[in-house]
Amino acid sequence: MNTKLLALYGLKYNPFTPEVPTEALHAYDKLENFCWRIEHALIREGGFALISGDPGTGKSVTLRLLSERLGQVRDIQVGALTHPSARLSDFYRELGDIFGVPLNAHNRWHGFKNLRERWLHHVESTLMRPVLFIDEAQEMPACVLNELRLLTSTQFDSRLLLSVVLAGDQRLNEKLRRDELVPLGSRIRIRFNTEYASAEQLMQSLKHLIACAGNPSLMSPELMQTLCDHALGNYRVMCTMAGELLATAAQQEKTQLDEKLYFECFAVPQSPRKRKPVSGGAHG
């Protein structure tokens, strides 16, 4: 959306795109509690945390909020794995790039040892574990997940060198129940399941979005309630519909988005009535 159209609605940015600033993301109580546990327990003790849920229920928002908060913690190193489906050799290369450790692709033991030494030095100098975020973790091969488990612990599993936050859909939960991954699944210390939101939660998020964007009265109260009632508990669906409404309103130069506009955009077209066949044959 261009600057002219944003000015028409008194907006600093389009509040319904995925690229909204982190401060525009609404942290409800359960999410706040999860972030607090990561910030005050996991990064100091290490281990695995798991974020799981269906698409559109808030996994990406959780990762963004958590990454932003941990990025403000002094002396902590935070990295994110961007290629979760990579094979083991590429997995090591990316870890080396994230944590600044030169790795030899043909000497996995050298990479294993150097990464652990880097993390151990970080722990001893800061008393906190580095953090690794892995989104779409359901795409990771089982051998890579097991290698990550072995990488992150020492002294017969009594000392943890890294904090890992895995995020994925329900396939990740199913994957962690497989026999070869039970040792990893049993080490998940903190779990957070993003659930379908109530209409009240959606309303809180919607109000927060448009207020942070600069125009709390962008939508009529009736339209906001209608959006929340028809979003199926899904934040992504709500924002997609709201974005469509904003684009349509801008095209029509409407100053406020209202319920009438909603029915114009999302009215279900009525199928034409079928004509009844004429009974009887041809007259001779």
Question: What annotation goes with each model-predicted range?
Answer:
Residues R69-D97:
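AAA+/P-loop NTPase substrate/partner-engagement loops
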Residues L11-P18, A86-A105:
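Conserved NTP-binding/hydrolysis module of P-loop NTPases
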Residues R44-L65:
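Walker A/P-loop nucleotide-binding motif
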